[in-house]
Amino acid sequence: MDFTEKALVLRTGRFREADLWVRFLSPSRGVITAFAFGGCRSRRRFCGCLDALNHVLVKVSSDKRRTYLCLDEGTLLNGPVRLRSDWGRTGVAANCIKFVEAMGVGPEGAADAYDLTCGMLELLETADVVPEIFPVLFRGRLAFDQGYRIDPVRCARCGMRLKDVAGVRFLPREGVFECSAHGGASGGGFMMSAETLDAVRFVQENPPLMWTDIPLSPEGWKQWGRAVDAFIQYHVGLVWDKGRFRRI
């Protein structure tokens, strides 16, 4: 599998004195790990471009037995500037990247994941204000894009428009919303206000650069966070634990 294309560096690590492994997100192949032999020293082949969050044009080949990938060359396309000096924003980016890695992205969902992750970095690089709950917004949208999409428009039981009812409950295990007419017959779940439902729709339909305009109250943010974390825990099997995402 030999190819040349743009990619986003997610993480790197050293496995010998002069060699690196590089994990990157490709818009056509998803999350891939390749070995950059001489990556710590070769300025001609890599030009110092293998820092996390850099966009790089990569040239990748397979070894003779086709058991692993080799990163032969990398050319820096662009990299963040503000993120390098703003630790708060760096932390938000790191949290989002960890989720991309933990969830795993294959070729089928690669384009959406790449666009979303690039949009996340653009917002963190350019926006004046970053919502505190941004990592949770990102996790929800990535899950939606990778096949776990939910319908925040109609009740899953009767088809009634959720905008037209007074109370709505979200059921994480089923991944559906039901209106108050059913009285929580399924048991469990979380009550969702109209503003939180609007936020779910907005995040599903718009890129990250527009998420700074979501008019949610503190209670609305709490509802979103509880619902998304419970949904991802049940369907994706990931929880945030001691600074990392852990499979359960």
Curated annotation (Swiss-Prot):
GO BP of this protein = DNA recombination; double-strand break repair
The terms describing its cellular component in GO are: bacterial nucleoid
- Disulphide bond pairs: none
**Which parts pass through the membrane?**
none
Pfam families, A to Z: RecO_C (PF02565), RecO_N (PF11967)
> Which InterPro entries does this entry report, sorted A to Z?
ARFGAP/RecO, DNA_rep/recomb_RecO_N, NA-bd_OB-fold, RecO, RecO_C
The answer to whether keyword DNA repair applies is yes
Its domain of life?
Bacteria
Query: Which key words are in the record?
Result: DNA damage, DNA recombination, DNA repair
What the record says about family reads:
Belongs to the RecO family.
Function of the protein: Involved in DNA repair and RecF pathway recombination.
Which HAMAP family does the record associate with it? RecO
Q: Which PANTHER family match?
A: DNA REPAIR PROTEIN RECO
Question: Could you tell me what this protein is called?
Answer: DNA repair protein RecO
